Swiss-Prot record:
Residues 316-332 have a biased composition (Low complexity). Highly expressed in skeletal muscle, thymus, pancreas, placenta and lung. Detected at low levels in brain, heart, peripheral blood leukocytes, testis, ovary, spinal cord, thyroid, kidney, liver, small intestine and colon. The gene is PLEKHA1. The modification Phosphoserine is found at S332, S362. It comes from Homo sapiens. This is Pleckstrin homology domain-containing family A member 1.
Amino acid sequence: MPYVDRQNRICGFLDIEENENSGKFLRRYFILDTREDSFVWYMDNPQNLPSGSSRVGAIKLTYISKVSDATKLRPKAEFCFVMNAGMRKYFLQANDQQDLVEWVNVLNKAIKITVPKQSDSQPNSDNLSRHGECGKKQVSYRTDIVGGVPIITPTQKEEVNECGESIDRNNLKRSQSHLPYFTPKPPQDSAVIKAGYCVKQGAVMKNWKRRYFQLDENTIGYFKSELEKEPLRVIPLKEVHKVQECKQSDIMMRDNLFEIVTTSRTFYVQADSPEEMHSWIKAVSGAIVAQRGPGRSASSEHPPGPSESKHAFRPTNAATATSHSTASRSNSLVSTFTMEKRGFYESLAKVKPGNFKVQTVSPREPASKVTEQALLRPQSKNGPQEKDCDLVDLDDASLPVSDV
């Protein structure tokens, strides 16, 4: 289906019989440009072709006299129509019936507009900028589509009117941002590191347009063409985080694709070849490193400060204090255990045989707890005694003897 691109040209794919009467139709990409008064075709979309690829064929619209349906002339070719251009007939084949009708209509409309008509007393819409009344300003408008938004800018035509009088000098004043395409670019303050054409994806419409990129020491910008003075956009290198080969190139169906990642947006740019892609990545990365310096990218290591050393010694001091307290507590427990042991044996010496009672351990209490309770339990000076116990005979041989 024919569609209108950003330059207001009608584009689309058709099959054309390039060799007359051969009956062989080849797939080509057609562009109908009424401003250039031409109908040209390429092997593929020029955006997908390498830079400098030439067109396959072209016809001036002024040479086309009529465009009509040719299904009866070529019954074997479906949806066929014919263009009568001079001494030759060009047969083309559309995709379907609706595609055929639309191409025939737009071509007939184009040749009606572009063919000059001397008998017309009133200028048509296409020639309003060329013909005007004597003594009046001739104002034309230029439409640019930037980021999917149409921008209409009034411009002045540098020409002489039909009455032979030169246009007023006020008409020759131009805005500095809207100079003609043939104006050469002035010398830049920063040296240009790399420049060339690449294909870029739009931010809003997500379509791909061929732009002229230019990299200098501080920025990377892209222009509509190499003859433009003002760039469509300038990206400061300080906002660029990284430049790398795009990992989504297979998803986007684009070869030689790399991405420029910034703070607000990721720019997808397609180069003409893998070598050109790597050259752009290397050039932009080198410019970023040269601007920021290698010191910023390297991570600096700081030695530990006095506060860190102070904290580092705290665990050692705490461990030392803990060990001292544990040792003192162990010595205290050993002393207590020794004293209690002596008291225990002294009490046994005063107890009658058969009256000695052993402490029972509860199944719910651990042995360590019972031992600690036994050690810490205060005892009388003479040891535990019962009320009904008799006097102990110290000469009894059955009494236990302790070596104290």
